[in-house]
Regions:
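Intrinsic-disorder/low-complexity detector
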Residues: 1-116
Length: 116
């Protein structure tokens, strides 16, 4: 959680964007952003993240105000930790960090549900 490595943070951000989509679309969701964008986001973030963030803004509008605030805070915290633009390409070791960040963030989501 305290890791500031850019690929790790991008993985965490991807997980949050996925959760926003899942909550906004609910049972209407056939294909998730993970199905469609995971590999591209992990290899060429600069070409994918602007699109994903625009989609998230549309999805946020469908949520209750409380969930909008919750996710906006998460997005602001994660994006605020990015120290540069989205990278053009991630190396294989960086892709590994992306995957770890994604699954750490996803696990945190499931852990919170279990505790509730």
């Amino acid at each position: 959680q305290d890791c500031n490595a850019l690929p790790y943070l991008l993985g965490r951000l991807f997980s949050v964007l996925e959760q926003i989509q899942q909550e906004a679309m609910g049972s209407e969701l056939n294909t998730t952003i993970k199905d469609r964008y995971f590999n591209s986001a992990m290899t060429h973030p600069v070409y994918v993240y602007p699109t994903l963030i625009k989609l998230a803004e549309k999805h946020l509008a469908k949520l209750s105000s409380g969930r909008q605030v919750y996710f906006s805070k998460q997005l602001t915290q994660l994006i605020g930790r990015l120290n540069s633009n989205f990278p053009t390409q991630l190396t294989l070791p960086e892709q590994g960090a992306f995957i770890i960040g994604y699954y750490h963030q996803t696990q945190q989501r499931y852990t919170k549900k279990t505790e509730e």
